[in-house]
Amino acid sequence: MKYTTQMDAARKGIITKEMEIVSKKENMDIEILREKMAKGQIVIPANKNHKSLDPEGIGSGLKTKINVNLGISRDCPNVDAELEKVKIAIDMKAEAIMDLSSFGKTEEFRQKLVNMSTAMIGTVPIYDAVGFYDKELKDITEKEFLDVVRKHGEDGVDFVTIHAGLNRDTVKTFKKNTRVTNIVSRGGSLLYAWMELNNKENPFYEYYDELLEICAAYDMTISLGDALRPGSIADGTDASQIAELMVLGELTKRAWEKNVQVIIEGPGHMKLNEIEANVILEKKLCHGAPFYVLGPLVTDIAPGYDHITSAIGGAIAASHGVDFLCYVTPAEHLRLPTLEDMKEGIIASKIAAHAGDLAKGVQGADEWDLKMSKARQKLDWEEMFSLSIDDEKARRYRKESSPEHEDSCTMCGKMCSMRNMNRIMEGKDINILRSED
Amino acid sequence: MKYTTQMDAARKGIITKEMEIVSKKENMDIEILREKMAKGQIVIPANKNHKSLDPEGIGSGLKTKINVNLGISRDCPNVDAELEKVKIAIDMKAEAIMDLSSFGKTEEFRQKLVNMSTAMIGTVPIYDAVGFYDKELKDITEKEFLDVVRKHGEDGVDFVTIHAGLNRDTVKTFKKNTRVTNIVSRGGSLLYAWMELNNKENPFYEYYDELLEICAAYDMTISLGDALRPGSIADGTDASQIAELMVLGELTKRAWEKNVQVIIEGPGHMKLNEIEANVILEKKLCHGAPFYVLGPLVTDIAPGYDHITSAIGGAIAASHGVDFLCYVTPAEHLRLPTLEDMKEGIIASKIAAHAGDLAKGVQGADEWDLKMSKARQKLDWEEMFSLSIDDEKARRYRKESSPEHEDSCTMCGKMCSMRNMNRIMEGKDINILRSED
């Protein structure tokens, strides 16, 4: 092998087969793609051990991608049920799946997942550590934390969330700046607990170079987690969040020195007018690295509808340059998502990504909308259904409510503007009262 | 009576009882409210014949309001079924209901609606004209169109959509600038048809002064309709739309000369990065009149999910100064909404309005979110439910998936960040493995 990672290849001027695939999918000139990868503006998460992967690029100028969270846990230990979700998520064209398994047969699940998934796979190794070692959190050693990451690399995981920006300095900032919801990142709170209980530095920060060696060995992309992301509107864009983002910027450069591909994770909860500033800050402080956000949720008051609060935030974020959206389901803040929750979350997230792509001018994004609108103008229902983000639902909705006239729908009936405009523009009369035509 | 309309009162320095109610609800100084009403920046739609009205203000500095569309039609003629929806819409705190009835016992429905509704009532009189006169559209006379408006005024309608900006000039612009989806406004397309079939000027434009006399007599607010609103991403912010908006600005001034309160209606479909410019244009060209938008829908490709595409657009619009959102349901582009569709539409729209209010800094808007986040930090589930935009759904979601530990939820179980942070910050240990606590 003439290169270690995709970034190393890009910097050496080598075109990998993954680059070729991404270049074709996105209709991006391969030299431009390679240059952006060399600069870290685009990543192709592709672990050398993930043989079934259909690679996707994430970053500048590319379509906004979405991630689906799954995994087994104490409250939901059924491997087969989760693998069923995986199949559907892939059918629904999620580009990434994060395995957040925290309990039970996590190794079996992860290996099956990597084996079957054409979508890229991400994990948060710290979730797996307690179960893997069967040791209480505070007793896990620094070396053991790193070994879990290595294990995930061996298993073919394409990107790992590592909360390396939570260090003694950012913890000081956190303690000085009171928050309403403290640390809401699951991995972040576990690391904070470990640091406090052991009075030690964050092992992922302290042994960051070793971590990078592991990532480079498998070409595992590092997704720098935002342990201090805001968990409420009140905490949005606060000192702790920005202090951590600055550390993530430093860690980005160190990763790039070792040709490790980097993604930056972002909020969280914030008022929608703060989103643009957050994207600008990330792109600046993290030197153009791809930005991956969880939401942002633009209000706290809608549990049961956080697929909507995050679709609002995600669309705005994507329009300003966010590259990768983590889906949020209606179950957020309430329970583990069911299969139906997952589907709703995927669709809301894909809508947000596409709305963002239209706004940021991703090449070809508006062709889809143009086709749909032309079908609407022609009242070509079959064409409309086939272009719908959810063909089945659109079809079902119309079928459940049959219109008087086949060309219109029950919303307007014979007052359908499309129907009447088409007639008038063809020089025909229109009628509302008569039923013969 | 010492004044004709709320605007007339405001200009004469008179404080009406409606102003007092709105001032208290919004916690806005009554003199500021009165001044803004005198300038046309705030309206209180309140027909003198709508006795059951609980008045609401719409405009600058006030909470963003939402409207629910209802009504009987050929495909859904059941008066009682629609009145049942009305009750639920009011229970769900929709501030406005537009009766879009187009067929059947529209008079009976409208009168019952006004009689029972504490929410303000709007109509689009042209929808009612064909049925009211039992005459084909093109045979309805100018005087008859105006008489329908008068009838709605007598019946106590608080605001009427009048597409007076579609005139011979704007039709010329429309014909010169090809569109993908032509005219998608139902009322707009009917008026266009009438104008083309009769080769005449738009009666609402030609007899605008007479129309204003009618509106002034009942203090019926005029909601200047956007006949030329874009119906597709491709047509967003085009020449026809802006040409009409300029006419609406002229008509606004003419209405204000007669103390008639004015709302401006807006898009429609557009890329999300165009929304801010649209709000700036409306506020400028229409001299600060309140802006009422249908969406905007930020993509065309999601029939079945247009409550989400419009929540994205509506939240952004509200954040930039839009004052009033027309709800959009999952049934948009497919069928008349069912009761369930209506509920989903109301909630999505309320989320958008509130997210906008947080961003534009409406007084007190963030208190709701702060309370919710404090409840989350305390893991006080009862408090969270009672603060939820949909208490029932939030409760049901949690109940359907019981967690191992009562304080957490099945999403994270014992890895709950709130739970663990609270323990660590109290100096306690945490455990993930042991089940005893």
Curated annotation (Swiss-Prot), chains A, B:
The record ties this protein, via Pfam families, to: ThiC_Rad_SAM
- Catalytic activities: 5-amino-1-(5-phospho-beta-D-ribosyl)imidazole + S-adenosyl-L-methionine = 4-amino-2-methyl-5-(phosphooxymethyl)pyrimidine + CO + 5'-deoxyadenosine + formate + L-methionine + 3 H(+)
Q: What positions does the entry give for Zn(2+) binding?
A: H269, H333
Q: What class of enzyme is it?
A: lyase
Residues given in the record as [4Fe-4S] cluster binding sites: C409, C412, C416
According to the record, cofactor stoichiometry and binding are noted as:
Binds 1 [4Fe-4S] cluster per subunit. The cluster is coordinated with 3 cysteines and an exchangeable S-adenosyl-L-methionine.
| Obligatory cofactor(s) | [4Fe-4S] cluster
Q: Membrane among the record's keywords?
A: no
What is one Gene Ontology biological process annotated in the Swiss-Prot or TrEMBL record? thiamine biosynthetic process
Could you list this entry's UniProt keywords, alphabetically sorted: 4Fe-4S, Iron, Iron-sulfur, Lyase, Metal-binding, S-adenosyl-L-methionine, Thiamine biosynthesis, Zinc
Name any one GO molecular function: 4 iron, 4 sulfur cluster binding
Domain of life according to the entry: Bacteria
**Cellular component GO terms, alphabetical:** cytosol
Q: Which residues bind substrate?
A: N69, M98, Y127, H163, S185, R186, G187, D226, A227, L228, R229, E265, Y292
EC number in record: 4.1.99.17
Pathway where this protein functions: Cofactor biosynthesis; thiamine diphosphate biosynthesis
Q: Which InterPro entries match?
A: ThiC (IPR037509), ThiC/Bza_core_dom (IPR038521), ThiC/BzaA/B (IPR002817)
Q: Which family does it belong to?
A: Belongs to the ThiC family.
**HAMAP family given in the database record:** ThiC
Task: Report the protein's function.
Answer: Catalyzes the synthesis of the hydroxymethylpyrimidine phosphate (HMP-P) moiety of thiamine from aminoimidazole ribotide (AIR) in a radical S-adenosyl-L-methionine (SAM)-dependent reaction.
Q: What is this protein called?
A: Phosphomethylpyrimidine synthase
